């Protein structure tokens, strides 16, 4: 049974609606605003625009190609540039202040934050419990930022040491830090360092528990009380317990396709459930508590990108290589609607070839279309196209900030 999380209804009300709306009252204005940030595939550049008024746009130079993350409650967009050994930050120009029965919204122009991070191949970014954590795959450490300070333009990281550099992640949970752990096995050339599993540490990097086996650990997400990570054997779940981190491995069941694993996970904010990839043409809905832990969704074509809808926690979307966007019902674990939204983009070729990416913006899904030089606006209601926004170059990775609030 999927567990609903407190605050889901409020979240849905907060995020519902798209574009920009105002409702005048004697004392306040209700404002809904979404701002879209798009990274170019070929040149170091991020383009930002307001969804309902795309002529309100800004351009930010970057060192290299970016992966974009909305962090610090949407006040900041992190631009992770793995190949350029750099992480830059952009203040989104949108911030929220919670007042219990409502939240205030402040809107201004986006602006680059002067401070940036540099280090050997930053890759996975994890945000949880007010912390933003970046793993340096070739550095043997992670850097930890305070989300509130980052929203104020301060990037002053602390460092979490790892025993060996590897492609992994670090995340806070309870009073400890969870870190992937690599083997000390010698590797040749560009071969990846084997990853053994997940372990709890204190802030100085001292072990605070035993290693939980999760061979080839990759991908992480939070939902409710749990963190989940993909493994060769199954999906490892972790929650904070009275005596430290509590681990449970959910083995892949025999009735799932064999020879493939989960390596990318998304966590719902309104119900305690995860959506993960399962091979190139499948998804799994994962319940960390109740059986069946896995429910498999076969896709008609290979997956290009997928996302969860924060306003409708039981809903997800997946784009497949034929150019179709599919709505996923997580409660039923099935595709409930589909529509063609782009030309086909084959998954053959390099993993980083220019292909569409999707993100949620209230009652719209925004889809980058690199070959067309567009961001497409797709209605969640019926998957119809509401409009397109031209973006110079090859629009690729995407992040959205914003929502609804009150101005006084």
UniProtKB/Swiss-Prot annotation:
Entries under InterPro entries matching the protein: AztD-like, Quino_amine_DH_bsu
Signal peptide start and end residues: 1-21
Chain sites annotated for binding Zn(2+) 2: 99, 102, 104, 408
GO molecular function, one term: zinc ion binding
Motif (N-terminal Zn(2+)-binding motif) on chain: 23-29
Variant or mutagenesis effect after changing residue 99 to A: Loss of zinc binding to site 2 and loss of zinc transfer to AztC
Effect of residue 102 to A: Loss of zinc binding to site 2 and loss of zinc transfer to AztC
Protein task: Acts as a zinc chaperone in the AztABCD zinc transport system. Directly transfers one zinc cation to the solute binding protein AztC; the transfer occurs without the formation of a stable interaction. Binds 3 Zn(2+), two with high affinity and one with low affinity, and transfers only Zn(2+) bound to site 2 to AztC. Likely functions to store zinc in the periplasm and may be important for zinc accumulation in zinc-limited environments.
Protein name (record): Zinc chaperone AztD
The organism of origin for this protein: Paracoccus denitrificans (strain Pd 1222)
Source lineage: Bacteria, Pseudomonadati, Pseudomonadota, Alphaproteobacteria, Rhodobacterales
